[in-house]
Amino acid sequence: MSNYAVYSDDGGITWHTSKTPACTNGDEAKVVELSNGNVLMSIRNRAKGYRLFSKSTDGGDTWSEPKLNTTLLDPACNGDIIAYTHGGKNYLLHSLPASPTTRENVTVYISSDNGETWQAKRRIFNGYSAYSSLQVLEDGTIGIIVEEGKWDGGLPGEDGFNLGYYRFSLKWLLEGDPVEPVAESAE
């Protein structure tokens, strides 16, 4: 299975496929345009352990060899990555389960250098959890939807999932504000 980028430069009138794959051992990739115009692809690593990243310097036409980022754990699970600008500073936010082997403890990581390093992280959900999706809200806070496993003593996840919705601020993420993210029921 390979990760190619399919993209449009004219609002969806025409579409292009990258000439080279970003990765041949991953799937469920997410892309984000960096503050310098390059494109970063975050790739689910089917081998588990750590997240894979590939970069394009030509708008998604060709991709670098994928590299493991040993800061971002990846239990072979989908995650999300978004660009976020606040106070004149550019950030990347990435949500993933914080385990190399088990889908649990969905956490948000933050980078201020276009994904080269990931300095801060805060856990959103404690326990069995998997896919997540991030969104910058109109008021500048960040919303996240998380698959939260229900567990009644069997194998994690076999009892199904609830969707949890949380909202948090950049301050909470960066400074460790003791206020937990605001949960809004999405059940």
Regions from the language model: what does each represent?
Residues 1-187:
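Asp-box/BNR beta-propeller blade signature and adjacent active/binding-site loops
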